[in-house]
Amino acid sequence: MAKNAIVGQSGGPTSVINASLAGVYESCKRRGAGKVYGMLHGVAGLLERRTCVLDDKLKTALDIELLKRTPSSYLGSCRYKLPDWHTAEGETVYVQLFEILKELDIGYFFYIGGNDSMDTIGKLADYGAHIGSDIRFMGVPKTIDNDLMVTDHTPGYGSAAKYIGVVMKEIIRDATVYGTKYVTIVEIMGRNAGWLTAAAALAKAEDCEGVDMICLPEVPFNVDHFVEKVERMQKEKPSIVIAVSEGVKLEDGRYVCELADDVHAVDAFGHKALTGTARFLANTVARLSLIHISEPTR
C-alpha cells in the first residue's frame, strides 16, 4: 500500500507559494502517493493535529489551476521554531510530531518556505535519521528575498521584484510632479540580502530615469557619507528618490534602524523586526535642512 504525503507552508506568503503547493500535490499523485494531507498553519498546526486531506479539496483540474493563481498561503502559515532535539525537553516535541506522522502513515513530508523553514526541514530530517525513520523530508524553496543557498532564483522573488520596479516608477512620477525640492526614501524588505532593493533598478527605462541611489545591506553604510551624497545630488536635481534596504548596516555591524527610537519586536527565530530605517534617514536629512517640503495649493 502506498505511503501518504503531507505538505505545509511556512513563513511569509508570496504570490506563487500556492503554485508550489499545487506542484507538490500533482507530483505526489502522479508518482503514486496515497492520500496527500495539508498542515493547517505549518508544523505549529500539525503539533495540534490540525490537518486536511487535499484530495477532498482539489477534486478537479480547475481546482488545481485556481489554487496556482490564488495569492497568500492556502493552508495557512506559522513562524514556529523547532527546539533542539538533543535536549530531553526538545525531543518530546519531535516524539509527538513523529507519532502524528505515524498515525497518518506519512512517507513523504514537504515543507514550503524560506531559510527558517529549511531549518525546520533540516532538524526533522536529522531526527528522522537518528531514530531510523524512513520518512523522506523535502524542503520546497519559497522566499521573496531570494536568499536561499544554492538556489539561483527562488519562487516568489520574480513577482516581488516586478512589483517593486513598478511601484518605484510610480513613486518617481509622484516625486517630480511639483518641481520643488524633495527627497523620497523608500524602505524595502531585505534583512541580509539586497536582491529586492536592487530590483528598484527595474524602474529605469526609456520613460523613466530610475532611482537616484540604491543602498544594500551587503555594503557597509555611513550616515554622514549618505547625507553628503544627498546634498551633492540636490545641487543637480530638485527631486531625489532613494531605495534603501531595511537591513542596511553601519560599519560596526549595527543596523541603521537601531539608531532610531523605535521599539523592535523579535520573532520565534530571534529575528529583530527591522523598521524605521527610512524614517531615521529622512529625519536626519530634514534636520540638516537638506530637504524642503511644500504642500501643493488646491
List the predicted regions and their residue ranges:
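Gly-rich Lys/Arg/Thr-decorated short loops/hinges at beta-loop-alpha junctions or inter-strand turns
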Residues: 3-7, 68-83, 142-152, 179-182, ...
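Short glycine-rich or small-residue beta-strand-to-loop segments that form or flank ligand, phosphate
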Residues: 4-12, 74-78, 107-113, 139, ...
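Short, ordered loop/turn segments at secondary-structure junctions
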Residues: 10-12, 39-45, 79-80, 114-115, ...
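Short glycine/serine/threonine-rich phosphate/pyrophosphate-binding segments
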Residues: 14-24, 46-47, 92-95, 115-123, ...
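Glycine/threonine-rich beta-strand-loop-alpha-helix active-site module
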Residues: 25-61, 122, 126-173
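Glycine-rich nucleotide/cofactor/substrate-binding loop typically near the N-terminus or early
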Residues: 28-104
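Accessory alpha-helical/coil subdomains and C-terminal extensions
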Residues: 100, 108-113, 119-134, 154-290
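Residue-level detector of conserved catalytic or cofactor/ligand-binding positions
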Residues: 291-297
